[in-house]
C-alpha cells in the first residue's frame, strides 16, 4: 500500500499534456499508418525545437508545422499549446469543423496539413536521433 501511495505521489508531479498536442497526435493517427512517436526526434525539426535545414521531406513537414504555430502566436489570445479545436476523422480523411474562432481554425489547419504531410512523406530511419551539430546546419 505504501508503494502505491508513493507511486501516486510521484505521478502527481507529471504535468498534463496540452490538449492541443493530444488532438495533433490523434490527427497523425487518423491520416497515416505510423504512430506519433515515430516523429519524436526525427530530423532537425520533428520534436521540440529545431534548427538548420530540414534533412528530407518529412522533416520539412515538421519545419512547416513549427512555423505555422509561430504564425498562430500572432493571432490575439491564440496559444497553440492549449487551444483546442474540433475536427472529424474518417480515416485517412481529416476535416476541420467550421468555426468563427480564428485561432481554432488556424491551429486545426496547421495540424491537419502536417498530419497529411507526415502520411505522404517517406520515412528514413537514418534520420532518427541525428546529431544536430553535424546534420542541422
UniProtKB/Swiss-Prot annotation:
Keyword Calcium attached: yes
Compartments, record wording: Secreted
Record organism: Bungarus caeruleus
Enzyme class of the recorded protein, top EC level: hydrolase
Propeptide feature ranges: 12-19
Main location: secreted
GO BP: arachidonate secretion; lipid catabolic process; phospholipid metabolic process
Binding residues for Ca(2+): 45, 47, 49, 66
Tissue and organ distribution: Expressed by the venom gland.
Pfam families, sorted: Phospholip_A2_1 (PF00068)
Protein name per UniProt: Basic phospholipase A2 3
Enzyme Commission identifier(s): 3.1.1.4
SUPFAM superfamilies, A to Z: Phospholipase A2, PLA2
Bridged cysteine pairs (disulfide): 30-89, 44-136, 46-62, 61-117, 68-110, 78-103, 96-108
One GO cellular component term: extracellular region
Keywords: Blood coagulation cascade inhibiting toxin, Calcium, Disulfide bond, Hemostasis impairing toxin, Hydrolase, Lipid degradation, Lipid metabolism, Metal-binding, Neurotoxin, Presynaptic neurotoxin, Secreted, Signal, Toxin
Family: Belongs to the phospholipase A2 family. Group I subfamily. D49 sub-subfamily.
Keyword Lipid metabolism carried by entry: yes
Cofactor list: Ca(2+)
Cofactor note: Binds 1 Ca(2+) ion per subunit.
InterPro entries: PLipase_A2 (IPR001211), PLipase_A2_Asp_AS (IPR033112), PLipase_A2_dom (IPR016090), PLipase_A2_dom_sf (IPR036444), PLipase_A2_His_AS (IPR033113)
Gene Ontology molecular-function annotations: calcium ion binding; calcium-dependent phospholipase A2 activity; phospholipid binding; toxin activity
Subunit structure: Monomer, or homotrimer. Was firstly described as a trimer, but has been reinterpreted with the possibility of being a monomer.
Active site per UniProt: 65, 111
Signal sequence range: 1-11
Catalytic reaction equation(s): a 1,2-diacyl-sn-glycero-3-phosphocholine + H2O = a 1-acyl-sn-glycero-3-phosphocholine + a fatty acid + H(+)
Function: Snake venom phospholipase A2 (PLA2) that shows anticoagulant and neurotoxic activities. PLA2 catalyzes the calcium-dependent hydrolysis of the 2-acyl groups in 3-sn-phosphoglycerides.
